[in-house]
Amino acid sequence: MELIHTCYRITDVDRSVAFYRALGFEERRRMPIREEAINVFMGVPGDADRLELTYNFGVDSYELGTGYGHIAVSVDDLDAALGRLEEQGIEPERPPYTVREGGSRLCFVRDPDGYRIELIERRPD
């Protein structure tokens, strides 16, 4: 078994692609779906397409629902990743913190459509 991808419905293709690029994702391909939508597939270097961003034409907003939590993304340098996001006006929900002494640093941000993203800078064991 393998987790193939996660799909988010987005309201602005360029803004969403820029957000995920700032985290280190690469845009792999765009696939139109008739006259209804376009899917943008993204992945991190060395891995398959794991994120599908779906833009439905004529839809202005979505309700996120109460069942969604977040996705977690590993970053090499949390401060650098936050700096790239701050250039886009994205701020962390609260300052980064260390899970336990000598452990991973992390924080949460929201993507342009409000989805929570956990950013984790792992420390060597």
Segments (PLM) and residue ranges:
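Vicinal oxygen chelate
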Residues: 29-32, 41, 73, 82-125
